Curated annotation (Swiss-Prot):
Belongs to the glycosyltransferase 83 family. It is an enzyme of class 2 (transferase). The chain crosses the membrane at residues 8-28, 81-101, 113-133, 136-156, 176-196, 204-224, 255-275, 289-309, 313-333, 351-371, 384-404, 412-432. This is Undecaprenyl phosphate-alpha-4-amino-4-deoxy-L-arabinose arabinosyl transferase. The gene is arnT. GO terms for biological process: lipid A biosynthetic process; lipopolysaccharide biosynthetic process; protein O-linked glycosylation; response to iron(III) ion.
């Protein structure tokens, strides 16, 4: 009976966090609409080998993450829920693996369940895990690699050991096909230090080749197939997407070495008060409990590895939160009955965070705020109140944990619930018009659907148009963006129209049908009306503008 009650409560908890909100939030550009459109095109054209984006070659990522997204759209259709369910599915399987590993380590269901809950409610995990990007998928394979190696390392028989190493290779191979060679590097930097500390390096040399073989076997069919269809894929993917992005001085997303420290602290909310003690406990237990050191290696070593890279994004450290969640849960349970101040500190941090964030919404972002250009307009008072309420709910849960003391410290898992349910309803119109063009496109849907040609000046905007209109022939106007490589192929000629050539291009193509030009305006575009032909219709909302040119004989 008790188990049934817990199962029902967990199901409700999971649905409120990870299922109900998915359809309630508009898709964000460029990331979510990009992956939505790539998978839509794969389902339409049936090519599950070569990624295409707006009918152009798109070699920034391998294929396996798209496969998971494809299945989501195949099962649930073309909607926001279907776009995001691949990420949710991946992060859910990761949580189940976290449960499995914690159970193997501590032999306690309560610790294992709490580890999964901590993982699912860490702010970074929830934010990325309910967002349509590929990081949840690669996290799944890295967590699977972490569990597979532990299975091999603790096996009682040679068969189990061999199976564990083979599973490790399969997980790494799938990670490689999801996000690239980092899926091979991360397990190495996490496992090798632990093996050296345990004086088992010889075992690594003996069984490691099994993992390499299984990784090669699972990746070979696709790797060979795409090399045959697109001979330049591996050159571009390895040198441009890996070497330039992570090592060269002009890498994308450059950030200082310490960049991930604040990301880790913010991402560990609402459990960050337990973080110092959890890491310290893992180090203190390193001799008598090799599992604690193993989790510590999987937390710290990838973090250092990503910190050394030139290019950095918060999503890169998502895999670190799986072992960290187990350490946090283990530490929390250990100190719950000892009168430790860490649980009180964690509750106070949540109260402070919720109150400060609510005050920031009311005093800074609101139309009466202290800044000269508030984020919310005067017509969005309800959004201000909802946003503040979401953070005040966070603070209220923190206060409840503080009052209840060590007995109910696990209630911190409810802190992000207000944000989870209300996030889609509190996005300011300024942000919607810039980053969520779906509502703008819906307003001009009839015009766009009857246009023979549709042009967009940003890749993110173009992908949203393609997704909403269910057509992949959107033309790029004036800016290549991330599709510069795909546009360089001879068969992509005519897919890009330069601003200086637009008048001539328009006069030629209006004979074939009407033309819609959709732009997201920047400061450089303030005089755009003077540089393009006068339209037959114009629709302007926020930073988004539609110019419509009817067909001419």
């Amino acid at each position: 009976m008790k188990y049934t009650r817990y199962a029902l409560l967990f199901s409700l908890f999971y649905a409120l966090y990870y299922l109900i909100p998915l359809e309630l939030r508009a898709l964000w550009q460029p990331d979510e609409v990009r992956y939505a459109e790539i998978s839509r095109e794969m389902l339409v054209n049936g090519n599950w080998v070569v990624p295409h984006f707006l009918d152009l070659r798109y070699f920034e990522k391998p294929i396996a993450g798209y496969w998971i997204n494809n299945i989501g759209q195949w099962l649930f259709g073309s909607n926001n829920f279907a776009v995001r369910i691949g990420s949710v599915f991946s992060i859910t399987l990761s949580a189940l693996l976290v449960y499995w590993l914690a159970l193997r380590l501590w032999q306690q269901r309560s610790t294992a369940l709490l580890s999964a809950v901590v993982f699912l409610t860490c702010l970074l995990v929830y934010g990325v895990g309910s967002y349509a990007v590929l990081d949840p998928m690669v996290t799944l394979w890295l967590v699977a690699a972490m569990c597979s190696f532990w299975l091999a390392a603790q096996s009682a028989s040679r068969l189990q050991k061999v199976s564990g190493w083979l599973l490790l290779g399969l997980a790494c191979g799938m990670g490689l096909m999801t996000k690239g060679f980092l899926a091979l590097a991360v397990p190495v930097v996490a496992i090798v230090p632990w093996m050296i500390w345990q004086r088992r390096f010889k075992e690594l040399l003996l069984f490691g080749p099994l993992a390499l073989v299984s990784a090669a076997l699972i990746t070979a069919p696709w790797a060979i197939s795409i090399a045959r269809q697109e001979p330049d894929f591996w050159h571009y993917f390895f040198w441009v997407e890996h070497i330039q992005r992570f090592a060269q001085s002009d890498a994308q997303h450059k950030a200082p070495f310490w960049y991930y420290l604040p990301m880790l602290l913010a991402g560990a909310l609402p459990w960050v008060g337990l973080l110092p003690g959890a890491l310290q406990r893992a180090w203190r237990e390193r001799s008598e409990n090799s599992g604690s050191l193993y989790l510590l290696c999987w937390t710290v070593m990838p973090l250092l590895f990503f910190s050394l890279a030139k290019g950095k994004l918060p999503t890169y450290i998502l895999p670190c939160f799986a072992p960290l969640a187990i350490l946090l849960a283990h530490h929390g349970i250990k100190i719950a009955g000892t009168g430790s101040k860490a649980l009180k500190a964690n509750a106070l941090i949540n109260v402070a965070f919720g109150v400060i964030a609510a005050l920031a919404v009311i005093l800074v972002l609101a139309p009466w705020g202290l800044v000269h250009h508030p984020l919310y307009a005067k017509s969005e008072i309800s959004k201000v109140l909802l946003g503040a309420s979401a953070f005040l709910f966070w603070a209220a849960v923190g206060l409840a944990c503080l009052v209840a003391g060590a007995k109910h410290w696990r209630l911190a898992a409810l802190c992000p619930l207000g944000l989870a349910l209300l996030a889609g309803a509190v996005i300011p119109d300024k942000v919607i018009d810039s980053k969520q063009p779906q509502s703008f496109i819906s307003a001009v849907d009839n015009t766009l659907k009857h246009s023979r040609f549709v042009l967009a000046n940003e890749v993110g905007l173009a992908s949203t148009l393609a997704w909403e209109l269910k057509r992949s022939d959107i033309q790029l106007f004036d800016r290549h963006g991330e599709l510069e490589y795909g546009l360089s192929y001879p068969d992509a000629k005519g897919r890009f129209i330069n601003l200086n050539d637009f008048s001539r291009w328009l006069s030629e193509h209006r004979r074939e049908g009407s033309v819609s030009l959709v732009m997201k305006l920047s400061d450089d575009d303030q005089y755009i009306d003077e540089r393009i032909p006068v339209p037959d219709q114009k629709y302007h909302r926020g930073r988004l503008v539609l110019w419509y040119y009817s067909q001419q004989p």
